[in-house]
Amino acid sequence: MSEPRKILVTSALPYANGPVHLGHMLEYIQTDMWVRFQKHRGNQCIYVCADDAHGSAIMLRAEKEGITPEQLIDNVKAEHSADFADFLVDFDNFHSTHSDENRELSSMIYTRLRDAGHIATRSVTQYFDPEKKMFLADRFIKGTCPKCAAVDQYGDNCEKCGATYAPTDLKDPKSAISGATPVLKDSKHFFFDLPAFDTMLKSWTRSGTLQDAVANKIAEWLDSGLQQWDISRDAPYFGFEIPDEPGKYFYVWLDAPIGYMASFKNLCARRPDLDFDAYWGKDATTELYHFIGKDIVNFHALFWPAMLEGADLRKPTGVNVHGYLTVNGQKMSKSRGTFIKARTYLDHLPPEYLRYYYASKLGRGVDDLDLNLEDFVQKVNSDLIGKVVNIASRCAGFIHKGNAGVMVDANAAPELTDAFLAAAPSIADAYEARDFARAMRETMALADRANAYIAEKAPWALAKQEGKQDEVQAVCALGVNLFRQLVIFLKPVLPNLAADAEKFLNVAPLTWDDHKTLLTHHQLNPFSALMTRIDPLKVEAMAAASKEDLTATDTSTDAAPAGNGELAKDPLSAEIDFDAFAAVDLRVALILKAEHVEGADKLLRLTLDIGDEQRNVFSGIKSAYPDPSKLEGRLTMMIANLKPRKMRFGISEGMVMAAGPGGEEIYLLSPDSGAKPGQRIK
């Protein structure tokens, strides 16, 4: 028998400024099912998580509520913990990034990086709120759009016309926090030298640690050239102060992933059987897996492994990425009642129904998952009640009535039990590969065969015939054994059903290997209903409650990333209709020339080839591309039908597209290889 595997598993850390919703729960349920499967198989699998408890957003919300940030994160942690527990997400430890362990580990990792020469400093110019005495992120600046003159727009994009721009381009800028007019101010920032790890990352990301689609996306970023990563923020800021640098704090995304380590270290203090270095030391032979949403891939597949490498620590065995959640084919919506908080769901429906539905649709890829509420009702009622539970309810009564609840020693259909036994390795492989949808399909196919057998034998009809009692008992004993097999296969997804079934079956907690045996001459306990059908009215009530509580209290946007990434900190803009989008002409452009603009602090002049003509475009990306010549020869994406804009330095004939919060973190977008200048993007 092989030695049990030693596995450490994490989910992305939920941000500690509000409740979790069903989009978040997709990730935690997915991770929990995989962890439960590993434990079911006899492996030592540890599952840790924590609240992501730092950042300006938390500091400002606490101030708005008249409490300290510590009080806010304690309150939110209690809410998160209750929601996770009630959704049967069984963490071995749920901690907080605002902890002594995380402070110690963050300082240690930073110090190692600094001493190894991987930290640089330079001056950065940003808007500063003179009343609040704080530097302002782009989303904390509002003013008049420089393109369409719409008022009350954010510092990086216009919600009315969709334009993106640098905060310094905004007209009449105001602090969104105090209303004061911000001023430009220089500050020393600290940068992690990510480009120094380019070779390692190119190898590591192609070593099987990522899904192919994710590795391909990472390759695009690597091929475009990595930039140094700004890891500091200025006081006032809620977080950890950088060692030996008063008034300078770690950016939340530096200490957030270190929170995985901190939560595990906190657990190690209570579990003498666990050795921290055995899981995080450079030469660790244990397994380490991160489950995340696709919105935070860059942090986990670029910054995080590079930090670990530079700090002489182990890198993850795998980073498992999933897509977003949609509801009824659309993004979650307050107005439609489909922006559903975890607690709102739990107030109306049992957690295992959603766990099963997610499992039935979760493959191993990064595609988005749609929660169709009508399909949800139909699938749960059909599969769980109509197929799985139905087997036990059909058979148990005959065993109790005809044989005092004792299962006879008979296998009425060996070919059927052999089929169940033969299916187990494939189902296990599906679980291991995180292809839960395949595991559920194959399990339900077995349930169909079991139900077909019972329907064919019709014990309810046999019981009425003279001399058929032995056959009735044999058929029903087999039915209960097949039900037991199904429960074993479903236990990682449906732990409560498994526990209730174990009571009915009068057995110890089932393990995966129990599928190899049958119960014979075994006493059952009385059967009671294990699950009830979903009443569609309860789903309607849940949607109605979601409209009410989210309209009244929630400040989130309609977007529903299933993790805790950039959307949580930089919400989506307001919806536009299709006609508004269709009016934007997006084209592939080849950068022929890129150069500094004399007298401009943030602009580069780009000469673009869009097929049959050339365009001159000024772009505020200088801070991220100090050597513009490296952009020459690269394909990018541009808005080609934007009205030319006369600037002090010339006329700008369009706009190139980039992502990132601004400053040093600007990432020019590129199409996939094979695209040609002038091709329409659609």
Swiss-Prot record:
GO biological-process terms attached to the record: methionyl-tRNA aminoacylation
The enzyme's E.C. designation: 6.1.1.10
Cofactor: Zn(2+)
Entry's cofactor comment: Binds 1 zinc ion per subunit.
CC annotations in GO: cytosol
Binding residues for Zn(2+): C145, C148, C158, C161
Main enzyme class: ligase
Chemical reaction(s) catalysed: tRNA(Met) + L-methionine + ATP = L-methionyl-tRNA(Met) + AMP + diphosphate
Record-linked NCBIfam families: metG (TIGR00398), metG_C_term (TIGR00399), PRK00133.1 (NF001100)
Name of the protein: Methionine--tRNA ligase
Organism, scientific name: Pseudomonas syringae pv. tomato (strain ATCC BAA-871 / DC3000)
